[in-house]
């Protein structure tokens, strides 16, 4: 069902190591408003959508979110590439290194590991779409916060792209929500 394309949705070429930003951006991988949770949320909710249109939308967006996971992980790798132990210690990433070495692992910015408790799936298309719209808005706000924390255009560019995709996803969910409300789904 899935087809892997070996290019990112937006080119990422971060030239400067920035461990502080990596420490913050990891939240969009494994945090409550991050891309991993979004992908799993939508790919699970799709099964109980009442029609093929809803199933297709959640599948499309859930699959795109997996691409966003790849983008965030690429950013994390490029932001930390070549970091010394002392540099990791200086920004508080030594505790992360102690458990994961140089691997990328889904946590929030405080180091709390990803949990499926970050998202809900209740089998009700209206409730699920409401959850999905809220999730997209929270992700958008998080991207805006991250953008405000850097001046590096190599970081800002991908973050702006991801922010814009959150807005588009919100609008697509909103359209389906309104359609389902008109059809009388509860």
Specify the residue positions occupied by each region the protein language model found:
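Non-heme di-metal
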Residues: 1-186
């Amino acid at each position: 069902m899935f087809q892997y394309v070996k290019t990112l949705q937006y080119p990422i070429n971060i030239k400067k190591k920035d461990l502080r930003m990596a420490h913050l951006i990891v939240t969009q991988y494994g945090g409550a408003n991050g891309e991993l949770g979004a992908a799993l949320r939508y790919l699970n909710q799709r099964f109980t959508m009442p029609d093929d249109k809803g199933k297709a939308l959640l599948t499309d967006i859930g699959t795109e979110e997996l691409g966003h996971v790849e983008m965030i992980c690429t950013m994390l790798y490029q932001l930390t590439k070549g970091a010394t132990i002392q540099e990791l210690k200086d920004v508080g990433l030594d505790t992360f290194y102690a458990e994961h070495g140089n691997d990328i692992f889904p946590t929030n910015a405080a180091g709390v590991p990803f949990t499926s408790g970050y998202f809900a799936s209740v089998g009700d298309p209206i409730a699920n779409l409401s959850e999905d719209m809220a999730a997209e808005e929270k992700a958008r706000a998080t991207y805006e916060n991250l953008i405000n924390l850097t001046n590096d255009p190599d970081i800002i560019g991908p973050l702006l792209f991801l922010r814009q995709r959150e807005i588009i996803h919100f609008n697509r969910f909103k359209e389906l929500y309104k359609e389902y409300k008109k059809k009388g789904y509860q």
